[in-house]
């Protein structure tokens, strides 16, 4: 019997996949970087995807909600992948190095010190309307602060990412919003410009803070 191929339309738009309960429970007892979840299980998620469609030119984004596990990275609330035209434009920066700076993520330093990121991310909002969508996710109690990442998305047109950090503890805070491009990157007028022919990507900083480009060491032919 032959079946006609059909696109999985239920994966188009905004989709949040649930975090398996054993993964949640293992955070506090696992062998590596034990951290008790600080968000109720019902508010967690595993992955959050934004998919415009199944054509090659359609854009796709994947955000991580889980920052532990066996082969783990501290990438909760980080954008793992952004692709358009069938090509990756934002990606993980390292296979081995797992700290937030190697991801499209937020680094929070308080009084000159860093802490391990929380294990799970809270899903506050994930809504798809007729022509646009909105998501809101929060990493709670991250080195004395809550970090909320809001994304406003018009499929195949633009993506607005707003990061808000709310201090819960008094201290001297330093914030680094990191982006990990795939391709030839440059900085102009506080914007990250990426060329990965035939695609181009502009990550524009609308708040005016200065930007800089750092070249990290190569590992396994990763840029």
Label the model's feature ranges.
Residues 3-215:
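Catalytic and substrate-binding regions of extracellular carbohydrate-active enzymes
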Residues 218-223:
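Short, intrinsically disordered, charge-balanced linker/junction segments flanking boundaries
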């Amino acid at each position: 019997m032959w079946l006609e191929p059909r696109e999985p339309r239920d994966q188009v738009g905004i989709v949040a996949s649930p975090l398996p309960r054993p993964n949640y429970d293992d955070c506090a007892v696992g062998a590596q970087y034990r951290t008790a979840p600080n968000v109720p299980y019902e508010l967690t998620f595993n992955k959050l995807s934004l998919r415009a469609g199944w054509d090659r030119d359609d854009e796709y984004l994947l955000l991580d909600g889980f920052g532990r596990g066996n082969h783990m990275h501290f990438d909760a609330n980080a954008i793992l992948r952004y692709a358009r035209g069938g090509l990756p434009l934002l990606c993980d920066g390292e296979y081995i190095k797992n700290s937030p700076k190697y991801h499209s993520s937020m680094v929070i330093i308080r009084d000159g010190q860093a802490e391990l990121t929380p294990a799970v991310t809270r899903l506050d909002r994930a809504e798809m309307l007729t022509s646009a969508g909105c998501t809101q996710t929060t990493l709670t109690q991250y080195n004395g602060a809550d970090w909320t990442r809001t994304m406003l998305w018009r499929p195949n047109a633009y993506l607005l990412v707003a990061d808000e950090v709310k201090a819960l503890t008094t201290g001297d805070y330093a914030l680094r919003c990191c982006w990990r491009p795939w391709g030839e990157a440059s900085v102009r007028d506080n914007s990250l410009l990426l060329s990965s022919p035939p695609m181009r990507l502009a990550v524009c900083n609308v708040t005016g803070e200065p930007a800089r480009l750092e070249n990290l060491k190569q590992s396994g032919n990763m840029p």
